[in-house]
């Protein structure tokens, strides 16, 4: 191979964080010759902030990443040291799988998977510039002068884009503690005409677990039967740990109030907006000052690591104030601070600059994923990375992009929210953001998305076999339970209370009743005992939601019709009589591709949508007439 060939790729991914790893893996699985550009190999897969994966809404994203044969679920299963299923007592649609992770195990597992991936080369170095041929991306220039040629680039800069760390009055450029920021790329993005903004996130101090008084604290255990994230994981083998729970005190709050003027957040030093749902401890005291305390989870960062992450006291106060605060918190009175908490500001691009493929509208072949799009969280980043990497590979190959709809996946909900509404603060996923969350459950992510992964060529043979085995078992169990039926009278003999309407009900129908599970039906039909535990749970959940799913299908059909109604690229919004000048301007700026996208433009009314649909039909009629006229002239 010549040196020129060695520096030529189909796809280049910049950044080795959660978005970058998923992007690089997806592009390589799609058949693209891929380069992952990162400063150092040993920082690939580093968990910059909290040592945890999943949670409410976020756990759904991890399951969807896994269903598309991504990495995060498998890596989390290898590194997880405290698995807990959140909202266990609520319905399956809103349950959130979560695990604390051993930072070292997570990083090493991710690095191993990146190393083993075919078609993927890790290139150590800093990305200094993007190379374009006209309005199309053509390569990346590294800080050492090397130029890598490519057909598409995925930019996953995280908090490194003009990153600035704040600790009280101190501030210094960094991508995260101890690592340099990316300083040149923002200028290049501005030169392309992108709209950049500033966002902020923060992290708590790190503590020496050997100096914490664990005996005085309440402890929280892992689930007795850990539920893995990945279809590929048979069982969790990593030892499980406990976490400590403590609270801030009125004395803590007094110290924070007395030093607010020294906090970077409240002194005016930070212009970026922080995440609403992960507030700093200063924010908690200012906004919820009437509370006598705020909960703190003390999360060990590893099985052989004494570092503890105090989840709940993210701060940008000076280090001396952080030490004072620790002395007022039960169990932490003598805790040694290993690293101060800090806030970090960074550049992001208005995600309305993106198509739903995560390709930028202004530069062909340039894709963005992760915090550069205004999101917060490993899971949100990983999900975007997978979609961007897949579509970058398809762009390089000249194929049509993959678009996930709101009706198909939480990934589709997130991307649609970002590209249609933009962000005013860091975006995080919640189940409440999805209109169709009864069908977008964590437990059925494989059924929803694995066939798509197979169709677009990113599914391994091993996963295909495992998926088909599980689906075959579920299909057989469904068929068996639908073939068995019972009358209300006979059901009463087995203490099943049904309406005495004379209607026979199948075992599958009975599973939709809240007080009936498979264990109760085995007394009637002993053959059901042969259904394995995994299939049993899937069948019970499916049957439980079957009635609701039938009702929801009509709503899904309406949205899918709107998604299919395309807005022609040549449509003149200014020519639509009755549309306000404000809406005309917003539509020209946003350039929605479907009626569904147009409906989510701020200020769009039902009347405006009707006008737009009428104009599309009129435009389509003119196009058809023009085509017929051309055909007639050709025939003459």
UniProtKB/Swiss-Prot annotation:
It is found in: Cytoplasm. FAD binds at residues 15-20. InterPro entries: FAD/NAD-bd_sf (IPR036188), GIDA_C_N (IPR049312), MnmG (IPR004416), MnmG-rel (IPR002218), MnmG-rel_CS (IPR020595), MnmG_C (IPR026904), MnmG_C_subdom (IPR047001), MnmG_C_subdom_sf (IPR044920). The keyword RNA-binding does not apply. One of its GO terms (cellular component) is cytosol. GO terms for molecular function: flavin adenine dinucleotide binding. Its main location: cytoplasm. Pfam families: GIDA, GIDA_C_1st, SAM_GIDA_C. Its cofactor is FAD. It comes from the Bacteria. NAD(+) binds at residues 274-288. NAD-binding protein involved in the addition of a carboxymethylaminomethyl (cmnm) group at the wobble position (U34) of certain tRNAs, forming tRNA-cmnm(5)s(2)U34. PANTHER family: GLUCOSE INHIBITED DIVISION PROTEIN A, PROTEIN MTO1 HOMOLOG, MITOCHONDRIAL. This is tRNA uridine 5-carboxymethylaminomethyl modification enzyme MnmG. It comes from Brucella abortus (strain 2308). The lineage of its organism: Bacteria, Pseudomonadati, Pseudomonadota, Alphaproteobacteria, Hyphomicrobiales. The gene is mnmG.
């Amino acid at each position: 191979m010549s040196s020129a060939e060695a520096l030529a790729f189909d796809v280049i991914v910049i950044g080795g964080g959660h978005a970058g790893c998923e992007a690089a893996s997806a592009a390589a699985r799609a058949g693209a010759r891929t380069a992952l550009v990162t400063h150092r190999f040993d920082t690939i897969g580093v968990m910059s902030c909290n040592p945890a994966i999943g949670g409410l809404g976020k756990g759904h994203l991890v399951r969807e990443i896994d269903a598309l044969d991504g990495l995060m679920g498998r890596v989390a299963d290898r590194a997880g040291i405290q698995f807990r299923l959140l909202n266990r007592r609520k319905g399956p649609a809103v349950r959130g799988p979560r695990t604390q992770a051993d930072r070292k195990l997570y990083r090493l597992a991710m690095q191993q998977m990146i190393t083993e991936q075919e078609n993927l080369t890790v290139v150590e170095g800093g990305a200094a510039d993007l190379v374009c041929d006209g309005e199309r991306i053509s390569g990346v220039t590294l800080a050492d002068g090397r130029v890598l040629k490519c057909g598409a680039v995925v930019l996953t800069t995280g908090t490194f884009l003009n990153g600035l760390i704040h600790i009280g009055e101190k501030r210094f450029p960094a991508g995260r503690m101890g690592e340099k920021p990316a300083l040149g790329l923002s200028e290049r993005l501005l030169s392309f005409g992108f709209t950049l903004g500033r966002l902020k996130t923060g992290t708590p101090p790190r503590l020496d677990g050997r100096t914490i008084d664990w005996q005085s604290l309440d402890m929280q255990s892992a689930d007795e039967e850990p539920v893995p994230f990945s279809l590929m994981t048979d069982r969790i083998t990593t030892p499980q740990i406990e976490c400590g729970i403590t609270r801030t005190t009125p004395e803590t709050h007094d110290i924070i109030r007395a030093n607010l003027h020294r906090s970077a957040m409240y002194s005016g030093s930070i212009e970026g907006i922080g995440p609403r749902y992960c507030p700093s401890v200063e924010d908690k005291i200012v906004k919820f000052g009437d509370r006598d305390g705020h909960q703190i989870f003390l999360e060990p960062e590893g099985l052989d690591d004494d570092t503890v992450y105090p989840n709940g006291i993210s701060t940008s106060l000076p280090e001396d104030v952080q030490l004072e605060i620790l002395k007022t918190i039960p169990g932490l009175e003598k805790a040694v601070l290993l690293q101060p908490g800090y806030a970090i500001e960074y550049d992001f691009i208005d995600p309305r600059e993106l198509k739903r493929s995560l390709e930028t509208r202004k530069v062909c072949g340039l894709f963005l994923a992760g915090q550069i799009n205004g999101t917060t969280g490993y899971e949100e980043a990983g999900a975007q990375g997978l979609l961007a990497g897949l579509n970058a590979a398809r762009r390089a190959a000249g194929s049509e992009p993959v678009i996930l709809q709101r009706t198909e996946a939480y990934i589709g909900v997130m991307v649609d929210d970002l590209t249609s509404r933009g962000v005013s603060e860091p975006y995080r996923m919640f189940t409440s953001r999805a209109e169709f969350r009864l069908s977008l459950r964590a437990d059925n992510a494989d059924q929803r998305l694995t066939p798509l992964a197979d169709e677009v060529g990113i599914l391994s043979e091993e996963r295909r076999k495992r998926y088909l085995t599980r689906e075959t078992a579920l299909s057989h169990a469904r068929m068996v339970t639908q073939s068995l039926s019972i009358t209300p009278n006979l059901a009463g003999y087995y203490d099943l209370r049904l309406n005495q309407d004379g209607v026979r009900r199948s075992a599958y129908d009975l599973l939709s009743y809240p007080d009936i599970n498979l264990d109760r039906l085995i007394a009637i039909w002993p053959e059901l005992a042969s259904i394995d535990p995994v299939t049993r749970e899937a069948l019970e959940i499916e049957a439980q939601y079957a009635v609701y799913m039938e009702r929801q299908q009509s709503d899904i059909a309406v949205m899918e019709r709107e998604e299919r109604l395309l807005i022609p690229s040549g449509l003149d919004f200014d020519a639509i009589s009755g549309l306000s000048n404000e809406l005309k301007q917003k539509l020209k700026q946003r350039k929605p591709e479907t009626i569904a996208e147009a409906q989510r433009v701020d200020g769009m009314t039902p009347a405006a949508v009707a006008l737009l649909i009428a104009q599309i039909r009129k435009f389509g009629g003119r196009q058809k007439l023009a085509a017929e006229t051309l055909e007639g002239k050709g025939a003459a």
